[in-house]
């Protein structure tokens, strides 16, 4: 009997900047249409989502701005475009909900992370409302105070 291959598990890439710049309201799981060399580079963890966003046009969702670095061992007869737009696979109901929300002022659709679901690559996209500068500072202050509180609780437990 053939030996079973282990599929990579967990997160491939995260977009931490999106979590910093937006109030995340709704999350969706979308499949992706990928070429063979892209799957190989994702298995190696060579993906960046820093300035990526989701464009909704003609009833379809497209991931733009993501960068998948091609491997040097990839095929030579295929021209690899690392920043090409990639189609996202969503249900019609989800697409309509996204399209209606993005039409409202202040809402954007961004990619939060790429991860493996069994042997498939999934993209977690979210509807977000843009944060103002003072919102970002407020969030940072809350995070710092929580960190201080956790540190105080930890040191108090060690003193006993």
Curated annotation (Swiss-Prot):
SUPFAM superfamilies for this protein: Small protein B (SmpB)
Location of region: Disordered: 131-160
InterPro entries: SmpB (IPR023620), SsrA-bd_prot (IPR000037), SsrA-bd_prot_CS (IPR020081)
Molecular functions (GO terms): RNA binding
NCBIfam families in UniProt: PRK05422.1, smpB
Function as written in the Swiss-Prot or TrEMBL entry: Required for rescue of stalled ribosomes mediated by trans-translation. Binds to transfer-messenger RNA (tmRNA), required for stable association of tmRNA with ribosomes. tmRNA and SmpB together mimic tRNA shape, replacing the anticodon stem-loop with SmpB. tmRNA is encoded by the ssrA gene; the 2 termini fold to resemble tRNA(Ala) and it encodes a 'tag peptide', a short internal open reading frame. During trans-translation Ala-aminoacylated tmRNA acts like a tRNA, entering the A-site of stalled ribosomes, displacing the stalled mRNA.
Name used for this protein in its record: SsrA-binding protein
Species whose genome carries this gene: Pseudomonas fluorescens (strain ATCC BAA-477 / NRRL B-23932 / Pf-5)
């Amino acid at each position: 009997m053939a030996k079973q291959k282990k599929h990579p598990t967990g997160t491939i890439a995260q977009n931490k900047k999106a979590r910093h710049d937006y109030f995340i309201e709704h999350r969706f799981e979308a499949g992706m249409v990928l070429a063979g060399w892209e799957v190989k580079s994702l298995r190696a963890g060579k993906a960046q989502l820093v300035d990526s966003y989701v464009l909704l046009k003609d009833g379809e969702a497209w991931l733009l701005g993501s960068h998948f670095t091609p491997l040097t061992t990839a095929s030579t007869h295929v021209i690899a475009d690392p920043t090409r737009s990639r189609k996202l696979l969503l249900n019609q109901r989800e697409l309509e909900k996204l399209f209606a929300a993005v039409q409202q002022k202040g809402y954007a659709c961004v990619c939060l992370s790429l991860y493996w679901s069994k042997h498939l690559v999934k993209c977690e996209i979210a509807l977000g409302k843009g944060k103002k500068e003072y919102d970002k500072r407020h969030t940072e202050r809350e995070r710092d105070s929580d960190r201080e509180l956790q540190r105080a609780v930890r040191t108090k437990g060690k003193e006993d």
